[in-house]
């Protein structure tokens, strides 16, 4: 019975993910957004058009295992990504207060009791965007039925069009994988400090 319930849950999650894919695909214009970030600024995708590529790394929830590991990878290996002429953001449907606390955390305790594990990480040196209304998540097709975003990364060109969508993000190697994808997509090298 337990196996049947687990199979149902996995199927349900897979179905929810596919049901929420919107119709975005490579070559489509990326939906604009105007969202608050953990650095105190508000970012709008249209502000980057004609200037820089943009990478949006959607994640389910701050302070969870995979999201903490992904943030750690991006904070510790961000120099690999910064070799390219683009701006990158992590983004979730968490409120700005929670994402700000997450960005500043240098250690996160995952699990409870005897199974608790402390993950040490650097403070995020990049903005984390908050989409508490979930409108941007819906526009990008990442909102799950459970109310959180799925872990997908969108690569957006200077022209505002989607260059690639990574639906198989590996949190531990997120920065390295992102840098490799930017190279593969032939995103211009960085010309600014």
Name these PLM-found stretches.
Residues 4-14:
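Bacterial N-terminal signal peptides
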Residues 148-193:
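Thiol-/selenol-based redox modules, centered on thioredoxin-like
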Residues 39-41, 133, 159:
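Residue-level recognition of short loop/turn positions
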Residues 44-68, 72-74:
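Short active-site neighborhood of thiol/selenol oxidoreductases, capturing the structured segment around
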Residues 18-46:
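N-terminal "domain-start" segment that seeds a small globular fold
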Residues 123-127, 145-154:
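Structural micro-motif
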Residues 46-48, 142, 168:
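Residue-level structural signal for beta-strand termini and adjacent loop
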Residues 68-122, 134-138:
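Structural microenvironment flanking redox-active thiols in thiol-disulfide oxidoreductases
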């Amino acid at each position: 019975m337990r196996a049947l319930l687990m199979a149902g849950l996995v199927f349900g999650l897979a179905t929810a993910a596919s049901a929420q894919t919107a119709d975005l695909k490579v070559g489509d214009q990326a939906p604009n957004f105007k969202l608050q970030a953990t650095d105190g600024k508000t970012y709008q995708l249209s502000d980057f058009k004609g200037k820089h590529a943009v990478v949006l790394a959607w994640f389910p929830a701050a302070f969870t295992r995979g999201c903490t590991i992904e943030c750690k990878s991006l904070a510790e290996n961000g120099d690999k990504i910064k070799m390219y002429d683009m701006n990158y953001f992590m983004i979730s449907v968490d409120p700005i207060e929670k994402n700000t606390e997450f960005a500043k955390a240098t250690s996160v305790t995952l699990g409870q009791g005897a199974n608790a594990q402390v993950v040490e990480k650097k403070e995020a040196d990049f903005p984390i965007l908050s989409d508490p209304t979930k409108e941007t998540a819906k526009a990008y097709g990442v909102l799950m039925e459970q109310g959180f975003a799925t872990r997908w990364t969108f690569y957006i060109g200077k022209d505002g069009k989607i260059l690639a969508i990574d639906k198989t993000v590996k949190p531990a190697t997120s920065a390295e994988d992102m840098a490799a994808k930017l190279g593969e997509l032939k995103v211009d090298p960085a010309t600014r400090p």
